[in-house]
Amino acid sequence: MGLFDFLKAKKTTAETAKNRLQIIIAQERSNRGGPDYLPLLQRELLEVIKKYVNIDVDAVKVDLVKDGQHDVLDISVALPEGPDKP
């Protein structure tokens, strides 16, 4: 209800920063069991893709997903829409 919104306590920037930090820590803890080569693999993939397409650093995501008895390497690359040459 819009009428009672002013009675709610506003979130402070400290609370927002704390929530974001908790998310980052949770992600780091979940990646702790993963192999050490994933960050290097991500950087090398980015370098190879940049030879052919002009992409952003955040365009390549590399994750290791445990699926039962198998580990699945999930690689996601967001390519630009147009003919963008390096």
Curated annotation (Swiss-Prot):
Record InterPro entries: MinE, MinE_sf
Gene3D superfamilies, sorted: Cell division topological specificity factor MinE (3.30.1070.10)
SUPFAM superfamilies linked to this entry: Cell division protein MinE topological specificity domain
Residue pairs linked by disulfide bridges in the UniProt entry: none
Domain of life: Bacteria
Gene Ontology process terms (BP): cell division; regulation of division septum assembly
Keywords: Cell cycle, Cell division
Family designation: Belongs to the MinE family.
Role noted for this protein: Prevents the cell division inhibition by proteins MinC and MinD at internal division sites while permitting inhibition at polar sites. This ensures cell division at the proper site by restricting the formation of a division septum at the midpoint of the long axis of the cell.
Protein name: Cell division topological specificity factor
Taxonomic source organism: Stenotrophomonas maltophilia (strain R551-3)
